[in-house]
């Protein structure tokens, strides 16, 4: 019986031609952009861990109290009845994401997304510590599960539990979380279950699923064809300068571009794509290919920038990108409208909510001189 037919068209970078999973083991190139991303990533991690401990006006800076139906956001408390305010806040954030994507592309994916931050700057370095570099990891793939590879999983599990507990603190607060950690899980089974499920999902994601979260699951990547245009900032390959390619340094008089087809940009990509094929859904603009290519250009005596930040227009024509265009002004105008409405409703909000409720028991009592109604008054402080 014959085997499966090879694919006649391009398959996903994370798949082999027969449809099996292709494990991605990117080679690390440390350059100027990697250093900037490293500083940014650890700053965001510090913010994620430290934000639940920050209190403003006696409340956590960010708390999503689902059971209490309260949302604390930097000193302001939103209730379930504040539907208008929450809607305006969400629309403002949503439009801001669209506007930034139109200007700087998927910079969020490569620089700020938790998937990239934790994968490339926490879990991947630990993996390299236990397994070695790209070549060693490929050898371990052929050997199957080994002691060297198995040792990383306890470290992954410990980190996953830590991330899950910090995540839980955003919903219950650090004070209650600390109380739970000092007691038996049987006394707070729901909280323990949420932490356990979150830790399991984090472990599954960073130990196995990895880049497929970006290329298969994440809807943001699917929207780039709508949110980007030919003037949006992307990471791209300069074909005019790089083509035609040559193996090794070009000889004097040879008609060859600067690209020496070393595949450094391919083996360093965390999603496994070849950036020279143009803008692709799987590209998260992490700039690893820029650092890799610049290091090769330095070795062969060529100027950097064969792979660089730019727009599709600038990469194809060499012309300078003009940022000014309708969407660059329409989105900020809409953001200004909704943000102004949010500020307006926040400023005119009352310092207290007074609610008249029906009393417990009989709604009224008949007395000799008249009828006495049973009522309850609920006064809720809304001042900061």
Locate the predicted segments by residue.
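Membrane-embedded alpha-helical bundles of multi-pass integral membrane proteins
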Residues: 1-244, 290, 303-336
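Short, solvent-exposed loop/turn segments enriched in Ser/Thr/Gly
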Residues: 370-376
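Short, solvent-exposed beta-strand/turn "edge" segments of beta-rich domains on protein surfaces
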Residues: 363-370
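Composition- and surface-driven signal marking solvent-exposed, interaction-prone regions
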Residues: 280-284, 295-312, 345-346, 357
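Cysteine-centered iron-sulfur cluster-binding motifs in ferredoxin-type domains/subunits
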Residues: 101-116, 206-221, 249-297
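Short solvent-exposed strand-capping/beta-turn motif centered on an Asx-Ser/Thr pair
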Residues: 380-384
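Hydrophobic alpha-helical transmembrane segments in integral membrane proteins
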Residues: 340-363
């Amino acid at each position: 019986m014959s085997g499966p037919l090879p694919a006649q068209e391009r398959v996903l970078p994370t798949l082999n031609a027969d449809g099996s999973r292709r494990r991605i083991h990117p080679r690390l190139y440390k350059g100027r952009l990697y250093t900037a991303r490293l500083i940014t990533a650890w700053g965001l991690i510090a913010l994620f861990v430290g934000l639940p401990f920050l209190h403003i006006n006696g409340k956590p800076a960010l708390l999503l109290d689902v059971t209490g139906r309260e949302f604390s956001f930097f000193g302001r408390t939103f209730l379930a009845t504040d539907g208008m305010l929450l809607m305006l806040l969400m629309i403002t954030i949503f439009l801001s994401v669209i506007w930034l994507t139109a200007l700087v592309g998927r910079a969020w994916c490569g620089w700020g997304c938790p998937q990239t931050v934790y994968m490339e700057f926490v879990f991947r370095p630990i993996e390299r510590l236990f397994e070695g570099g790209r070549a060693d990891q490929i050898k371990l793939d052929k050997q199957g599960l080994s002691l060297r590879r198995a040792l990383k999983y306890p470290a992954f599990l410990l980190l996953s539990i830590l991330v899950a507990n910090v995540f839980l603190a955003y919903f219950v607060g650090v004070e209650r979380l600390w109380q739970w950690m000092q007691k038996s899980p049987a006394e707070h089974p729901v909280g323990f279950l949420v932490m356990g499920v979150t830790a399991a999902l984090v472990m599954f994601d960073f130990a196995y699923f990895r880049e497929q979260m970006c290329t298969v699951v994440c809807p943001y990547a699917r929207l780039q064809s709508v949110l980007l245009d030919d003037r949006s900032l992307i990471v791209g390959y300069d074909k005019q300068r790089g083509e035609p390619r040559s193996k090794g340094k070009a000889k004097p008089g040879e008609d060859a571009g600067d690209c020496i087809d070393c595949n450094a940009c391919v083996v360093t990509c965390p999603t496994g794509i070849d950036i020279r094929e143009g803008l692709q859904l799987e590209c998260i603009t992490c700039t690893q290919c820029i650092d890799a290519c610049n290091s090769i250009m330095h070795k062969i005596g060529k100027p950097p920038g064969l792979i660089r930040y730019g727009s599709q227009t600038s990469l194809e024509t060499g012309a300078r990108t003009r940022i000014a265009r309708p969407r660059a002004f329409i989105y900020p105008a809409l953001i200004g409208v909704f943000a102004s409405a949010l500020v307006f409703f926040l400023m005119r909000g009352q310092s207290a909510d007074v609610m008249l409720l029906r009393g417990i028991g009989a709604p009224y009592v008949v007395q000799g001189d008249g009828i006495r109604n049973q009522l309850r008054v609920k006064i809720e402080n809304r001042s900061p």
